[in-house]
Amino acid sequence: MVMTNVAAGSALRVDEVRKSFAVPDAPGTRLLVLDGISFSMAAGELVSLVGPSGCGKSTLLRLIAGLDLPDAGDLLVGEEEILGPSAERGLVFQDPNLFPWLTVRRNIEAGLVARGVLHEKRHEVDEFTRLVGLGAFGSAYPHHLSGGMSQRVALARALINHPKVLLLDEPLGALDAFTRMRMQDEVLRLWENRRTTMLLVTHDIDEAIYMSDRILVMTRAPGRIDRTIDIKLLRPRDRTSDSFLRLRSQILEHLHFAGKAADV
């Protein structure tokens, strides 16, 4: 297999990926959503994906998660081709999708149950419950939790499988502004603790700048990578600094041209 435009030895490689969907009311017609997407991620890197609404960001995440297959191109984690779902790729959505009849601890265990390794790994449940700051809430049920706490459970459930890549599909999008900023710090703390490779889809430009090593800017559909922006600001980052605000203006300008003033 020959990989183009991507780095060999990467944690995640996406090479010339195309994806289309059938148009229900037009037999034989397909809508091209992704058109030649290529990028790679180094192990331990945190990268954000931004772009106009409908440009295919979530579709791309589904392909990397193995929930759907591309029409063309290659997706690899390490040297292994992505052909379906795997515990090597964790996925966290905007909705935490907790089981309401299970406690926090049991919800986190669900990640191990799905892999059939609960018996061998049960000792890690307490570790990950504490890791996300919920050590005192292991016996609580989802209806006792705030939105931010629920997302912490979802993160722990994904991380307990020790994924090589964690995919985050707007996981903080439903939270209020204050909680969202606190959870950004929480995700960064988990990332610094575990150094898990993370790919974050977000509509929040400030969030992307605050959290990421790099930002990939997509065009409107059919989605392509328009440009890559390296974020060289030291952490912790100051959202009010001149350098932060300059980056924000730069990215918004790129998005304006990439999306022709589409809603971002």
Place the predicted regions along the sequence by residue.
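Short, low-complexity, intrinsically disordered N-terminal peptides in bacterial proteins
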Residues: 1-9, 264
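Short hydrophobic beta-strand elements within the C-terminal catalytic ATPase subdomain
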Residues: 77, 217-218
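Residue-level detector of conserved, well-ordered beta-strand and adjacent loop positions
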Residues: 83, 93, 219, 230-232
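Conserved beta-strand-loop-alpha-helix hinge in the C-terminal portion
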Residues: 221-250
